[in-house]
Design a protein with these regions (language model features):
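Flexible, acidic/Gly-rich N-terminal and inter-domain linker regions that tether
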Residues: 1-7, 19-23, 217-236, 290-296, ...
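Canonical Radical SAM [4Fe-4S] cluster-binding loop centered on the CxxxCxxC motif
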Residues: 2-41, 53, 297-299
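Conserved beta-strand segments that form the floor/walls of ligand-binding pockets within enzyme
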Residues: 8, 12, 59, 150, ...
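Secreted/processed peptides and extracellular or luminal domains of membrane proteins
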Residues: 23, 27-30, 210-212, 274-278, ...
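Radical SAM/AdoMet-radical enzyme domain recognition
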Residues: 40-60, 68-181
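Radical SAM enzyme [4Fe-4S]-AdoMet core and its adjacent flexible, acidic
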Residues: 120-267
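Flexible mid-to-C-terminal extensions adjoining Fe-S/redox cofactors in radical SAM and related proteins
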Residues: 263-329
């Protein structure tokens, strides 16, 4: 392993998801819209190359990663490498099937659980990722085994009325951390009943967007102290959107506020038309492997720095990692 770099590799191992959330897009976090899953052999090859290039932090996402048959084996594989950490983004679908392996490596793993509301329906809109009794039981089982859990809450005009109560339930009753996220501006969304694209997608974003400043007074009231810029251990400061954090007892609430702007590389500022047109919001903060084996920066739509790793040998994969890691410096 080369000198460790202070970032992570996110991997969308599948585009399959058991839920269809209105604010998500086809393919989930992957840039691919196809229904596909990375083979275990391919994902192992990429992880080994990432580790050899200094990446020891990994985020497993999708789609819904726990739906993939090799999910447990994947955790075991990553843990074979020294000093690795794994973050798992899930809606809890099959997470308890892997409780043994998660408990085995609990010091190096954290679960990011998507929970957006207290109610299943708000204003007639379905919220599949709500705080159901099943979600509560899964959370308690994970915490009983000392596994770190964080609830990710995507805030919109629809669920804003429930967010404050949800935050306090999460922290005080379930002993989990929380991250509040404002709504990403995509060119397409799954929508309430049908997919929306182009102007319809932009109009939906405008109608639903809630500024995080709506919550700052509340967070100050319930916290003992705060930091204006704070990160978890997977990335360092001065990358992407600066995120504040509010501490309450042993737990915390992190806030992703896109109105604070983001940090970009020199390449972005000088060469990227998408950056110059204001079409990139998240900045540069991590690497991402999409389900079609294309390696890119997280959230980056500039295909001139997308690297197709299908059928590539180790030397070619290493060059791709080096090129993207240079943009993070």
């Amino acid at each position: 392993m080369k000198k460790r770099v202070n970032t992570y590799l996110a991997i969308a191992i599948t585009t399959y998801c058991n839920y269809q959330c209105f604010y998500c897009k086809k393919g989930g976090e992957s840039i691919s819209k196809e229904r596909e899953t990375i083979s275990f052999d391919d994902v192992k090859k990429i992880i080994a190359n990432a580790y050899a290039n200094g990446i020891a932090n990994f985020r497993i996402t999708g789609g819904e990663p726990t739906s993939v048959s090799y999910f447990g084996e994947l955790i075991e594989y990553i843990m074979k490498f020294k000093d690795t950490k794994v973050r798992i983004n899930t809606n809890g679908f099959r997470i308890l099937e892997y409780i043994d392996v998660l408990t085995k490596y609990k010091e190096y793993i954290d679960i990011v659980f998507s929970v957006d509301s207290l109610s299943k329906y708000i204003c007639g809109v379905h919220f599949p990722k709500y705080l159901s009794q099943n979600v509560i039981e899964i959370t308690r089982a994970l915490r009983k085994n000392k596994i770190s859990v964080r609830y990710n809450i995507v805030v919109t005009k629809l669920n804003e009325c429930e967010v404050r109560e949800l935050v306090q339930k999460a922290i005080d009753e379930l002993d989990v951390n929380v991250k509040l996220l404002d709504l990403n501006r995509f060119s397409e969304y799954l929508g309430y009943s049908n997919e929306v694209t182009g102007k319809e997608a932009y109009d939906l974003w405008q109608r639903l967007f809630v500024p995080m400043s709506n919550f700052y007074d509340f967070l100050c009231q319930i916290s003992t102290h705060s930091q204006i810029e704070w990160t978890t251990s997977l990335i360092g400061k001065k990358h992407g959107i600066p995120m504040s954090c509010y501490f309450r007892g042993d737990n915390w609430v992190q806030v992703k506020d896109s109105t604070r702007g983001a940090r970009y590389s020199e390449f972005c500022r000088k060469n990227c038309l998408l950056y110059k047109k204001g079409e990139c919001q998240e900045g540069v903060f991590s690497l991402f492997l999409s389900s079609n084996l294309v390696l890119h920066l997280s959230g980056c739509k500039n295909d001139s720095i997308h690297y197709d790793l299908n059928g590539r040998d180790n030397e070619q994969i290493e060059r791709a990692f080096k090129s993207l890691l240079n943009l993070l410096n």
